[in-house]
Amino acid sequence: MSAAVLATLAATALVTSFISGILGMAGGMIFMGVLLALLTVPQAMVLHGVTQLASNGWRAVLWRTSIDWRVFRGNAYGSLLALGAFALVQIVASKPVALLVLGITPFIGLALPEKLVLDVQRRGHPFLCGVICTVLQLVAGVSGPILDVF
């Protein structure tokens, strides 16, 4: 990887972090789009995952007293189920599929009818959110717009 690509990735990570911090959204999607433009799908997924783990993990540490562990457990179980299913069938999205899903993800959350919108207070919804968000993460690398609706 050239120094120019590394510099572009570092600058993009910084700028999209500011976008997320200021607007509270969209930074991860922009970052993933740039990663997919410059890297292969597996490389983009790993780099985005490590970046998100660092930023979201730190945020979880800072806000740990506000975590609803019931919601966390349900989400974690759903995530594990989706991850297990993907591991069994060994699906890796192609770049065109990843870009298409990345592009439609913001509209999925807005297009859901009221009765299908995920709600943290409703029974089983944290589990369902874990499944849906993990599938989106494994296909497009982002799930923020769906998680925001949740």
Residue ranges and their predicted role:
Residues A3-G74, C129-Q137, G144-F150:
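Small-residue-rich hydrophobic segments that form or flank transmembrane alpha-helices
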Residues N56-R64, A87, I91-G124:
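Transmembrane helix exit motif
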Residues G33, L83-A87, I91, V149:
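Small-residue-mediated transmembrane helix hinge/kink sites in multi-pass secondary transporters
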Residues Q52, S79-L83, G103-P106:
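Residue-level recognition of pore/gate-forming positions within transmembrane alpha-helices
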Residues D68-G78, A98-L102, Q121-V131:
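Cytoplasmic-side transmembrane-helix entry/capping segments in multi-pass membrane proteins
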Residues T105-F150:
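Membrane-embedded helical hairpins/re-entrant loop segments and their flanking transmembrane helices
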Residues V41-P42, N75-A87:
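Specific transmembrane alpha-helical segments of multi-pass solute transporters/efflux pumps
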Residues M1-T8, D119-H125:
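Membrane-interfacial loop-to-helix junctions in multi-pass transporters
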